[in-house]
Curated annotation (Swiss-Prot):
Keyword Metal-binding: no
Name of the protein this chain belongs to: Glycerol dehydrogenase small subunit
Topology class, membrane: Multi-pass membrane protein
Positions of transmembrane segments: 13-33, 41-61, 67-87, 92-112
Functional summary from the UniProt entry: Catalyzes the oxidation of glycerol to glycerone. Also acts, more slowly, on a number of other polyols including D-sorbitol, D-arabinitol, D-mannitol, meso-erythritol, adonitol and propylene glycol.
Record lineage: Bacteria, Pseudomonadati, Pseudomonadota, Alphaproteobacteria, Acetobacterales
GO CC annotation, single: plasma membrane
Catalytic reaction(s) noted: glycerol + A = dihydroxyacetone + AH2
Compartments (UniProt record): Cell membrane
Claim: Lyase is one of the keywords in the record: no
Keywords: Cell membrane, Membrane, Oxidoreductase, Transmembrane, Transmembrane helix
Highest taxon of source: Bacteria
Chief localization: membrane
Length: 126
């Protein structure tokens, strides 16, 4: 059980770990996506990577904004996937499966992030 002294629960540590994972995936997307965009490829990876980096940072700060940024990036991913390949399930799978699984995990962290935010507010932090 969390307290006002700042001790973290297991769910908070797991949420922070997920924030690190999202941040690292975002950095990979930004760096690899920039190379791809310079070669004339899709700018999706750069834009999505920026959203994921911001999401990971906010999750590490214990802010629900991080989860909602990720869910926005996931919606963007689905729109881009349909635009790229249409409604072909076999072609959608590699583009949307991994981000959707990660999105489910991120959505499950929203109550934990809210608790972290409220505790920080009680301590007087902004």
């Amino acid at each position: 059980m969390p307290n006002l002294q700042g001790n973290r629960t297991l769910t908070e540590w797991l949420t922070l770990l997920l924030g690190v994972i999202v941040l690292l995936v975002g950095l990979f997307f930004v760096i690899g996506g920039a190379d791809l965009a310079m070669l004339g490829g899709s700018t999706y990876y750069v834009l999505c990577g920026i959203l994921l980096v911001a999401s990971g940072v906010f999750m590490l700060m214990g802010r629900t904004l991080g989860a909602f940024l990720y869910l926005g990036a996931l919606a963007y991913t689905w729109v881009w996937s349909f635009w790229e390949v249409g409604f072909s399930p076999i072609d959608l799978l590699p583009r949307a499966f991994g981000p959707t699984i990660l999105g489910i995990l991120v959505a499950l962290t929203i109550p934990v992030l809210r608790r972290m935010e409220s505790r920080r507010t009680l301590r007087g932090a902004v």
